């Protein structure tokens, strides 16, 4: 994204190469040996479409973009397209080059023709070398309503006309609207004084050049003169003996050279070379005796201050501009998280916004665009400003990207989601897939279940999986966000069987096999599979436990995993039953393990129990473990290394499904 802004607003065509075209359109260039004018016009283009909101008092600046229906609004919407497109003479020039290539080949001796590689072999070969002369910048007026189409890019038909009569006039108009500054990801900062990297002191000295005033400071000029006189007096004394001898030297063409030394000091150079940044390491008033050079404070903090100084400089230069100042000042900050610890990353956006706000007046507003791979950077941000770039694949396997506008997230509870994601550091936005679990036990043990089975779950082990503990009653609240982001998602939840006791007025927890039992889990009732009766849930096949997310360009799947009936033996008898919760399934599917470790867990099994009695004992124990469910999970975690247990079947099934989904996406 930053590359596109730099390309279209700095207009350095040399920055663009053939590889900036999406690989999905390369076939339209490769193998093309003949090209007509009509075919050239259909060649791929690189576009940047912009939608601007303009206050009424600034409408005169965007008259070229406005239509009559905007005149009744206080804020007008205008749109324009910046395009890198084939020149009108591309086909002609390419065919001339091809003709010359064929002619050159024919002129080769017959023995060498087979080895001779004429240029260009095809259109791809031609553009590899001539892209910057074969393509040009174009500018169009767009219909702003075209931006309202959800999930759709602006089509060629959305352009309502050329922006100006000439490219030069169009560029001048665009420059009068938008000025873009870049804070690059590679900031060349270093703690090593001998390195070629920058430090804050060098940056501060550069800042002096930007902030230089045309007014003469007479007091500073007088001080500089006095300094020159003192320095000259010192230098004359030091060189007096040497120059006295040199002045007596005579030779061919040399007569009494009369050398002298004088002090010449440049105010700018003197200030620049004497500007060094120090940090005070002790609290209290400024004390030169308690300061250290900047290299002792760490690259993270230096990077942080560097970006703030850059933003401040950029705003000052834009606000101090003469003539027609661009209406919009956009500062694009690329991956600010470099070298910064998580806490500083979390504070960065808030501090940067406050820093910009201090510089602003009623008419000078700098806007920030921040690209990041860090969940900490968006820690203190609402949904509205977030644009989520989801990597996906076209049907032919071409890598692509879909941009989702989180301000359009359709949910009745955005405040809950925002607060929850803030607590979990927003890792969901940077994940390859998401697993939603009910409680502490699953959150503690699930990573262990994945890591100890890399052969069966290679994609899960190597991918970035966001594990969110959402609680049984809250998983459903994540449905809009999971669908919106389009990530493969696995919801691991519980059957939570309940039944009405005799003479009761309220359903209570019961064994899964209780007649007439239903689930109290709203995820199963309102999301997937959309059923309430326990017996129906247990009979649901795998296909009924997944749902296709149909939002966005590339749909993804969501699957639910809950307890299923499994066969176990106890007291010489075989039984077929399902646990009500994760903990019940863990114990019922690891009975042999419990024989050896029951005492450590705090639940020793009686060999004389019938299978039905055993299920009831497990149910009663899990309802109220002696030291709580979290402690039970930690005990299971601690014992695993010396005595591994088996992952419950329903979780194995769900993890295998998610691994296959990630494997399928990797193949695409």
Regions found by a protein language model. Give the residues of each.
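N-terminal cofactor/phosphate-binding cores enriched in small/glycine residues
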Residues: 1-23
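Acidic, Mg2+-coordinating catalytic modules of nucleic-acid enzymes
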Residues: 418-436, 440-668
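Hydrophobic positions in the central parallel beta-sheet of the AAA+
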Residues: 181, 331-333, 435
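Switch/communication elements of ASCE P-loop NTPase nucleotide-binding domains
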Residues: 1-9, 278-424, 638-668
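Glycine-rich phosphate-binding loops of NTPases
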Residues: 18-43, 56-219, 409, 508-550
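Conserved nucleotide-binding/hydrolysis micro-motifs of P-loop NTPases
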Residues: 54-57, 85-90, 187-190, 337, ...
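Short alpha-helical segments and helix-capping/turn motifs at coil-helix boundaries
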Residues: 32-36, 62-68, 153-173, 260-263, ...
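Extended helical coiled-coil dimerization/tether regions that scaffold
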Residues: 185-333, 360
């Amino acid at each position: 994204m930053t590359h596109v802004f730099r390309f279209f607003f700095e207009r350095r065509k040399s920055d663009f190469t053939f590889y900036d075209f999406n690989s999905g359109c390369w076939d339209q260039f490769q193998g093309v040996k003949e090209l007509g004018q009509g075919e050239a016009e259909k060649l791929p283009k690189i576009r940047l479409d912009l939608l601007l909101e303009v206050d009424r008092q600034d409408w005169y600046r965007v008259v070229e973009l406005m239509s009559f229906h905007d005149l009744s609004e206080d804020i007008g919407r205008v749109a324009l397209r910046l395009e890198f497109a084939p020149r009108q003479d591309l086909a002609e020039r390419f065919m001339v080059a091809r003709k010359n290539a064929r002619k050159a080949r024919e002129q080769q001796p017959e023995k060498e023709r087979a080895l001779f590689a004429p240029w260009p072999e095809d259109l791809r070969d031609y553009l590899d070398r001539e892209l910057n002369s074969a393509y040009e910048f174009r500018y169009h007026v767009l219909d702003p309503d075209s931006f309202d189409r959800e999930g759709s890019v602006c089509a060629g038909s959305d352009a309502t006309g050329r922006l100006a009569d000439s490219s030069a006039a169009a560029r001048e108009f665009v420059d009068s609207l938008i000025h873009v500054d870049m804070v690059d990801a590679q900031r060349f900062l270093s703690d090593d004084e001998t390195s070629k990297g920058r430090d804050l002191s060098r940056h501060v000295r550069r800042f002096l050049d930007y902030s230089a005033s045309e007014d003469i400071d007479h007091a500073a000029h007088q001080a500089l003169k006095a300094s020159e006189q003192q320095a000259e007096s010192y230098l004359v004394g030091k060189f007096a003996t040497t120059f006295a001898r040199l002045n007596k030297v005579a030779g061919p063409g040399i007569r009494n050279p009369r050398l002298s030394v004088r002090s010449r000091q440049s105010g700018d150079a003197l200030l620049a070379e004497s500007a060094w940044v120090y940090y005070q390491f002790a609290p209290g008033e400024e004390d030169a005796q308690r300061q250290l050079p900047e290299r002792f404070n760490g690259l993270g903090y230096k990077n942080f201050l560097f970006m703030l100084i850059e933003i401040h400089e950029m705003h000052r230069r834009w606000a101090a501009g003469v003539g027609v100042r661009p209406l919009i000042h956009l500062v694009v900050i690329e991956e600010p998280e470099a070298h910064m610890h998580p806490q500083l990353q979390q504070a960065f956006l808030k501090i940067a916004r406050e820093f910009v706000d201090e510089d602003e007046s009623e008419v000078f507003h700098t806007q920030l665009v921040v690209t990041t791979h860090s969940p900490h950077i968006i820690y203190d941000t609402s949904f509205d400003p977030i644009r989520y770039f989801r990597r996906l694949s076209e049907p032919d396997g071409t890598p692509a990207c879909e941009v989702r506008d989180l301000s359009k997230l359709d949910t009745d509870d955005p405040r809950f989601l925002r607060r929850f994601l803030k607590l979990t550091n927003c890792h969901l936005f940077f994940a390859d897939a998401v697993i939603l679990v009910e409680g502490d036990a699953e959150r503690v043990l699930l990573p262990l279940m994945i890591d100890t089975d890399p052969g069966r779950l290679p994609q899960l082990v190597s991918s970035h999986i966001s594990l969110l503990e959402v609680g049984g009653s809250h998983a459903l609240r994540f449905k809009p966000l999971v669908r919106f982001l389009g990530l493969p998602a696995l919801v691991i939840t519980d059957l939570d069987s309940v039944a009405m006791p005799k003479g009761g007025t309220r359903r209570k927890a019961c064994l899964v096999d209780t007649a007439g039992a239903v689930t109290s889990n709203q995820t199963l009732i309102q999301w997937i599979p959309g059923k309430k009766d326990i017996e129906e849930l247990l009979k649901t096949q795998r296909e009924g436990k997944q749902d296709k997310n149909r939002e966005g360009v590339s749909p993804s799947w969501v699957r639910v995993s809950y307890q299923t009936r499994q066969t176990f033996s106890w007291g010489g008898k075989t039984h077929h039953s399902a646990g009500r919760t994760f903990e019940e399934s863990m114990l019922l599917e690891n009975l042999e393990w419990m024989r050896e470790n029951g005492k450590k867990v705090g639940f020793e099994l009686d060999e004389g129990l019938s299978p039905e009695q055993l299920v009831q004992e497990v149910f009663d124990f899990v309802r109220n473990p002696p030291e709580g469910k979290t402690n039970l999970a930690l005990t299971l975690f601690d014992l695993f290394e010396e005595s591994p247990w088996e992952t419950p079947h329903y979780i194995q099934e769900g993890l295998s499904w998610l691994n296959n989904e990630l494997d399928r996406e990797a193949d695409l």
